[in-house]
């Protein structure tokens, strides 16, 4: 990816860390709402949905295109949901200056299905996925680890981050439930016109 200048921003947990890119050290700066993104062409954001929503205006108000890796904007009609191999042209219509990408499972699936769709229109796909607890964040992973210990030690299992015990179990939930009892993840497709 061609880069003239690289700026790294992060949370208090990441601020101050140093990363090497093309032989040069870059320090992560603390992202704040008054940061100025003038002159920034593209901002890749992968800090979770709440951070994406909180800083979207800060990032885009001077023309930067925000490519968001969270679920924050996936259901928004005025934010294109793009998988470049399938619908790159949708990235050109971004009224809010934001481009979202679908869940990783969806991305892999639609890339594989695009050539089939070109040969014979697909009417419906039923998919079952098994998502990792890590997708729910560090606190959820800590809970899973603690639940595993509790089960193995014969202790009562404490549940906090998930609706049910996750250790040695599968629960029928991915993402946040909507009013019709489906989850947002079930609605992510590669194009807003197909949502």
Task: List where the protein language model places each region.
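ATP phosphate-binding P-loop of adenylate-forming
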Residues: 169
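N-terminal Rossmann-like NAD(P) cofactor-binding subdomain of oxidoreductases
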Residues: 1-166
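Single conserved hydrophobic/aromatic residue that forms the stacking wall/gate
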Residues: 187-195
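Glycine-rich phosphate/diphosphate-binding loops and the adjacent beta-loop-alpha structural elements
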Residues: 172-178
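Short acidic, gly/pro-rich beta-turn/loop elements at beta-sheet edges
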Residues: 137, 178-180
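Active-site pocket-shaping loop/turn-to-helix segments
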Residues: 180-186
């Amino acid at each position: 990816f061609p880069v003239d200048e690289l700026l790294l921003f992060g949370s208090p947990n990441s601020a101050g860390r140093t990363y090497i890119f093309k032989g040069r050290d870059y320090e992560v700066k603390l992202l704040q709402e008054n940061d100025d993104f003038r002159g920034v062409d593209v901002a890749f954001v992968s800090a979770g949905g709440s951070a994406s929503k909180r800083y979207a205006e800060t990032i885009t108000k001077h023309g930067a295109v925000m490519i968001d890796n969270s679920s924050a904007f996936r259901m928004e009609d005025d934010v294109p949901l793009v998988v470049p191999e399938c619908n790159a042209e949708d990235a050109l219509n971004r009224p809010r200056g934001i481009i979202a990408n679908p869940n990783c499972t969806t991305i892999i699936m639609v890339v594989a299905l695009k050539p089939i769709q070109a040969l014979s229109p697909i009417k419906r796909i039923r998919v079952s996925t098994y998502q990792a607890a890590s997708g729910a964040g560090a606190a959820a992973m800590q809970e899973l680890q603690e639940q595993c210990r509790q089960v193995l030690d014969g202790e009562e299992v404490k549940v906090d981050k998930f609706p049910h015990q996750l250790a040695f179990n599968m629960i029928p939930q991915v993402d946040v439930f909507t009013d019709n009892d489906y989850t947002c993840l079930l609605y992510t497709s590669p194009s807003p016109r197909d949502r």
